[in-house]
Amino acid sequence: MTRQSIVRMTSAGFILGGVFVAGWTLISPWGSFAGAARGGSAQWIAAHSSHYLAALCLTFGLLGLAVQRLPAAGRGEAFAQLLFLFAMWVYGGTGAITSRMWPLIAHHAGEIVEADGAMFKPQPEFLQFIAVPVLAVGVAALLFTMWRARILPLAALVAGVVGAAMFFAPTAPLAGFPWIFFAASGALAGLALAWLGWSLRHGATPADS
């Protein structure tokens, strides 16, 4: 199997992953992350299962991209791929928690996930200072290097960077930004990642030497 065929096969990971990222924020119960009724609902489980599946699919897509690009990649691109991989580990871990453990907590100890519960008071430092920045910077860095490599068009880069930046706009109960920021963040970032997969699938070329 050639490197090009591996890239085209694994590019489906970026396409599906982008769809799942968009699904995560668009399906998620509107208005807030808090509340036992939200956290235990089928809608919540569907949204955060998309969150978890997005991480798995995007990691699979990155494997093919690494096969194609890493042998001749510069330091910047290599670092961006490693950062994106780390971002997917963190993103997948939080997705496993919110899709499986969170609904159990909501059903059996719902007061924990209320706005004034232990899940949000004090505010979760891991989410604010590690998970969100790593995800946002990891996505933006990978998309930027793919644009520089002439794989991704500028429109996709802009959509992805704007979406990644919106991850830094926390909504209720973490802060007061409108929920539309969260919904749009995943929609735009997911569009850009799916666009990357489409570009790789239909125009995969060997790494520049």
Give the residues covered by each predicted segment.
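Hydrophobic, aromatic-enriched alpha-helical segments typical of multi-pass transmembrane helices
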Residues: 1-209
